[in-house]
């Protein structure tokens, strides 16, 4: 029988094959055939469920390359582990959303309590519960289970847009989609929200139905419906908010101050982001008196800041700096960009000198003077 010569390299390879595998699994890596930028890391790049396991040591930033049902095989884990680490995902892989980060490894996790195994059934495109209603995927986090009508959230949609289109109330929408939150900050685009439930028909407002009004209170003032959320109870003058109305438009028309408007309608918020169309806002209260309108023939009063010798015209933008030496009268309809271009200044400086305008310039007030230059 001829002799066989074994090289040292071959011998090392044979020895490695005989050594038992280590009990610690290697860090999971995505398959090479997955289109890659770096989608896995020790820190999440996208928003993630706050109930994700605290001891997560490796994350997958989901951009849709790997279906939910394939995640365990891709990362060398079980579906039970994956669902336990990421409780926002349902047993049928619902709520596995693009643009979210998910845990694919947990170091130092306590052994799970034995129980009913989690299903590993591949997710269907839709879920059909016992009530016979097909639920499209993905859905808003925390959506109720008895939903029978859905609305797909497109990029840029606002809660107000959905309520107006679906003819449902704000209270019902938040009740059926609790994770959206009362300020609508949890509304996720490219998901489906609940806009109707089994056993409850949303109220539809028709053009022939007069808006309901509550019983006239003891002060004799009838409050029209619907109203801005959180509106004060001693209101005696109301303004109907049409589509496209801005806080500035209402203040100018009603000749009231910004401070009073926000005090009487606190849910509107200081940046006017909570102003709901097709509702009534309070623009006057019992015992309160709105400031009289400024006559068009009256020259705006001026003040002279001490020491700098510069006369400051009034009224001015809220939050304007005190060391301003150049001013621009803001006409109704002017935008920050128009002023910046005309005055040859930067947007950063304009917002810094007129902080009340807001970083997005959403609170630029017409018929006031803005600062466009400083000492």
From Swiss-Prot:
Keyword annotations from UniProtKB, A to Z: Chitin-binding, Repeat, Signal, Virulence
Phenotype caused by lack of the gene: Does not affect virulence on Arabidopsis, N.benthamiana and tomato.
Residues covered by region (Disordered): 108-139, 206-225, 287-317
Coiled-coil residue windows: none
Domain LysM: 57-104, 149-195, 237-283, 326-372
Stretches with biased composition (Low complexity): 116-129, 206-217, 296-317
GO molecular-function terms, A-Z: chitin binding
Region forming the signal peptide: 1-24
Stored InterPro entries: LysM1-like (IPR052210), LysM_dom (IPR018392), LysM_dom_sf (IPR036779)
PANTHER family: AM15, LYSM DOMAIN-CONTAINING PROTEIN-RELATED
Miscellaneous: In plants, chitin acts as a microbe-associated molecular pattern (MAMP) that is recognized by lysin motif (LysM)-containing plant cell surface-localized pattern recognition receptors (PRRs) that activate a plethora of downstream immune responses.
Free-text function comment from the UniProt entry: Might have a role in sequestration of chitin oligosaccharides (breakdown products of fungal cell walls that are released during invasion and act as triggers of host immunity) to dampen host defense. Does not play an important role during host colonization.
This protein's domain notes: The LysM (lysin motif) domains are small globular domains involved in binding chitin in eukaryotes. Vd4LysM contains 4 LysM domains.
Family: Belongs to the secreted LysM effector family.
Protein name (record): Secreted LysM effector Vd4LysM
Origin species: Verticillium dahliae (strain VdLs.17 / ATCC MYA-4575 / FGSC 10137) (Verticillium wilt)
């Amino acid at each position: 029988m001829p002799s066989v010569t074994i090289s040292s390299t071959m011998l090392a390879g044979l020895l490695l094959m005989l050594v038992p595998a280590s009990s610690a699994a290697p860090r999971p890596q995505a398959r090479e055939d997955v289109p890659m930028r770096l989608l896995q890391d020790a820190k999440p790049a996208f928003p993630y469920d706050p109930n994700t396991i605290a001891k997560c040591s490796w994350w997958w930033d989901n951009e849709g390359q790997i279906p939910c049902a394939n995640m365990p095989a891709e990362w060398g884990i079980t579906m039970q582990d994956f669902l336990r680490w990421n409780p926002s995902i349902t047993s049928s892989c619902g709520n596995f959303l693009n643009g979210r980060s998910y845990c694919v490894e947990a170091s130092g996790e306590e052994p799970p309590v034995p129980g009913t195994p989690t299903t590993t059934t591949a997710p269907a495109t839709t879920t059909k519960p016992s009530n016979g209603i097909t639920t499209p995927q993905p859905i808003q986090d925390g959506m109720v289970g008895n939903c029978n009508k859905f609305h797909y959230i497109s990029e840029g949609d606002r809660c107000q847009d959905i309520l107006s289109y679906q003819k449902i109330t704000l209270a019902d929408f938040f009740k059926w989609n609790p994770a959206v939150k009362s300020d609508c900050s949890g509304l996720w685009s490219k998901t489906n929200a609940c806009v109707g439930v089994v056993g409850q028909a949303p109220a539809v407002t028709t053009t022939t139905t007069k808006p309901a009004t509550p019983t006239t209170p003891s002060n004799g003032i009838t409050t029209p419906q619907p109203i801005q959320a959180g509106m004060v109870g001693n209101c005696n003058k109301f303004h109907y908010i049409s589509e496209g109305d801005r806080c500035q438009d209402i203040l100018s028309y009603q000749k009231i101050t910004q401070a009073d408007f926000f005090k009487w309608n606190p849910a509107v918020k200081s940046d006017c982001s909570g102003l709901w169309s097709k509702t009534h806002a309070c623009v006057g209260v019992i015992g309160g008196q709105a400031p009289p309108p400024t006559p068009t023939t009256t020259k705006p009063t001026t003040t002279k800041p001490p020491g700098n010798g510069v006369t400051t015209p009034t009224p001015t933008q809220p939050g304007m700096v005190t060391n301003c030496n150049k001013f621009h009268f803001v006409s109704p309809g002017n935008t920050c960009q128009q002023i910046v271009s005309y005055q040859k200044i930067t947007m950063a400086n304009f917002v810094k000198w007129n902080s009340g305008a807001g970083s997005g310039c959403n609170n630029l007030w017409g018929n006031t003077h803005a600062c466009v230059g400083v000492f």
